[in-house]
Amino acid sequence: MTTNNSNFKYPKDFLWGLATSAGQVEGAAAEDGRTPSIWDVFATKPGKIFNGETPAVACDSYHRFDRDVEMLKYIGVNSYRMSISWSRVLPQGTGKLNPLGVDYYKRCFEKLLKAGILPNITLYHWDLPQALEERGGWVNRDSIEWFGEYAYKMFREFGNIVPMWT
């Protein structure tokens, strides 16, 4: 079967992008106030992750985000879906925000926008703060309040610069 796509055009508002998650690319797992997530703890269990890899360094996007944005721009994407590490912005899962974590994400979102790339933010990608897991995790009825507080704080901090949320 032959398909001729020479006349095909994407719609003007089509979003062409890539996606990552904080735990898979950020690294810096114990820097600037970030506390462990359930994924960090799981990854330290022998035999659970190939070659014993952990999210501690990952792709080191935390330290290389400028270069990452340059590569995204070079590829030609106009959208980038990434997640916020809940334990980077709220080290205890609830309560006081970590200003270093908030500042990191604010800089990321601003760099993406300056490069013409729309940030599309995922609030949760399998990385519940370990502090909340120790309080019962998702099966604790309070988890509804925990997530609501987290979501509210993220929208309050970034809602004016982040156009898309998942």
Give a label for each model feature.
Residues 1-2, 121:
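Intrinsically disordered/low-complexity terminal segments and short unstructured peptides
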Residues 2-98, 102, 108-111:
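N-terminal structural segment of carbohydrate-active enzymes
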